[in-house]
């Protein structure tokens, strides 16, 4: 993703979000409760080309867009489902 905003930290989770998105807030709350470090990239402060490239890469037009260890998992509903099935911890450990 040449134009998409990137992160240089070692956080296992990256969330592409906007400040007014309730699902973005819920995803961050879930990760915070679990003690999982994450990078939060605010798409509202990024150039339109960055958002367009991210949307093209993931085929999703909504936020949040969540990556765990570089793997796109989807939005909040998918993150929550992974947590409920016990799969999120496995992804984070792997």
Predicted segment positions?
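Residue-level signal for short amphipathic helical patches enriched in basic/charged
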Residues: 16-22, 61, 79, 83
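Non-catalytic interaction surface on structured domains
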Residues: 28, 34-35, 54-57, 81, ...
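Short secondary-structure boundary/capping segments
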Residues: 4-7, 64, 80
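Short alpha-helical
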Residues: 22, 49, 74
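Local sequence-structure signature of Cys/Sec-based thiol-disulfide redox active-site neighborhoods
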Residues: 2-41
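Thioredoxin-like thiol-disulfide oxidoreductase module
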Residues: 43-61, 90-94
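Short, structured active-site "lid" loops
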Residues: 55-75
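Non-catalytic, surface beta->alpha helical segment in thiol-disulfide oxidoreductase systems
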Residues: 68-94
